[in-house]
């Protein structure tokens, strides 16, 4: 069975991590050393060497400050998608706040690439049962794809019973195709296996085994995500507040 998997990237810097949001003020973002250019180019090089096309969910705030990087991602044949503008949890926003943030980021990205932005991913997969209203707003603003619903149980995100396969969601404003990050059903629970911190925690052979099982047994694509800062061996330290955050 020939299954095409999905490699996705959340383009943000190390100090944007949601675990630090109460300790790193947005007004101070520009005071931190930026690592996003070098790390994203390192990732672009890896993808090019292996002939992989990816979807890059770019933070609007970053796109304003590194427009050449967004153009380079686009010029190298990758899809440029939206990660919002301010890196705020969706369920901490009012619907019209979310819409304004969505439009602001989309307009910046479309101006830089000359192409319509069709896909969106929320910070920390924060479209949960509390914020399903965001799906209708996405559809009403012309988005066709979303990757914000994580079918797991987590203190910050997740809808444990959500469909783990790529599927269509019908909203009053039109349809969206949802691309959940991959999970494996183990001991009656959905276990996240599709990248991010989970990729760093698990041995590589486990991830490869799960990828193969999702492709072969379930016949569906493996949806993987990574942040550029996760490839940085010299990442500056931000005062982590707990061992789990670190």
Language model: regions and residue ranges:
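Non-membrane alpha-helical structural segments and their capping/turn regions in soluble enzymes
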Residues: 33, 37, 95-103, 204
């Amino acid at each position: 069975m020939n299954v095409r998997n999905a490699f996705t990237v959340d383009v943000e810097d190390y100090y944007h991590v949601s675990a630090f949001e109460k300790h790193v003020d947005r007004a101070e973002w520009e005071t931190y050393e930026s690592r996003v250019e070098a790390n994203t180019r390192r990732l672009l090089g890896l993808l090019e060497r292996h002939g992989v096309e990816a979807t890059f969910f770019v933070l609007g705030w970053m796109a304003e400050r590194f427009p050449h990087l967004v153009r380079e991602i686009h010029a190298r044949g990758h899809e440029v998608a939206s990660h919002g503008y301010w890196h705020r949890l969706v369920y901490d926003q009012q619907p019209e706040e979310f819409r304004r943030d969505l439009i602001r980021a989309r307009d910046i990205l479309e101006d830089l690439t000359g192409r319509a932005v069709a896909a969106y991913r929320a910070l920390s997969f924060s479209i949960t049962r509390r914020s399903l209203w965001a799906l209708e707003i996405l559809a009403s603003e012309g988005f066709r794809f979303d990757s914000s619903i994580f079918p797991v149980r987590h203190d910050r995100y997740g809808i444990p019973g959500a469909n783990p396969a790529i599927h269509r969601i019908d909203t009053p404003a039109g349809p969206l195709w949802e691309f959940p990050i991959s999970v494996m059903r183990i001991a009656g629970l959905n276990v996240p296996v599709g990248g991010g911190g989970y990729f760093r925690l698990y041995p590589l052979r486990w991830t490869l085994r799960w990828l193969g099982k999702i492709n072969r047994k379930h016949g569906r694509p493996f949806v993987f995500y990574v942040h550029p800062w996760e490839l940085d061996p010299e990442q500056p330290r931000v005062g982590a507040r707990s061992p789990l955050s670190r």
